[in-house]
Amino acid sequence: MKIFLRNHNQVGNGLEEYFDIVGFDEAEKIVLWQDVMGEERGLAKLAHALKKPVIQIQHGRRGYTQYRYPFNKEMLSDKFCIWGKTDKDNLIEAGIPEDKLVITGTTVFRHLKPKIKHKGKNIVFSPDHWDYDIQENDKVVDVLRKLKGVNITTKVMEEHDIRKYDNPVFSNRNRPNHLEVCAEVLRKADLVVAISEGTFELMAQILNIPVVIANLFTPRPCNGDHRYLKFKLSFSEAVKKEPEIKNLAKVIRQQLKNPDELREQRRSAALNDGGIEIKDPLQRIVEVIKTTTI
């Protein structure tokens, strides 16, 4: 079978073993990582005009966000391969027909590696990514620089100004080594500090690494979309949130001393948000692509 593939965050890796990856015109089916904005949305519309099925593969944590308030986007995909129960529940609540949703799990987490022993306490800061490097990141950097007796690494991506951060480790979500870089950083991590709870934080939770959230985010437009002013970040119960920057260091110290406090919550997030109990997610995704019709 010939498919057109738009890959992002490496979620379509491995499909080349089962399908011929070809151009849009030649493809029998269209496989995308999103259908809500930009060129991908246009491709989904064109595919339907040409009677070609569209299959979406969830590319990151909380794949339901754009279909819920305040965005309320229409789902154009005929099938959506989602990670777990959390995504399905939220998409159904958003009005997406259940027959469009298939829990397949994801290949993202197969990149994770076992943790290794190390000296000292290692904290990884995961700056928030927006359409620019937001000021809240700077506030967290200031706190982390004042912490004594810990080692700081910063996991940055393409939106970040790498010069601002201590011991930056860079990866780009459009490059084939992105998840490998993330996994390698987490091998020696004792704690992750972040502003939002995304895919990287879920990778940490699967490895039973505590996550502290500096709950400082101020709503703002993103890429000119003012609906983001009404957008609120979602959090699982697997994180320790602190809204006051003056208390952040104290919470970090507390979690370093009590790393098992939220162990069960992290396990729940791994199951419900990540679908890690699902065996062979790639094979499930392949089956969805093969069987989807329009």
Feature locations, PLM:
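Active-site regions of enzymes building and remodeling cell-envelope glycoconjugates
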Residues: 77-79, 98-99, 122, 163-180, ...
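Conserved catalytic-core segment of nucleotide-activated headgroup transferases in glycan assembly
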Residues: 102-166
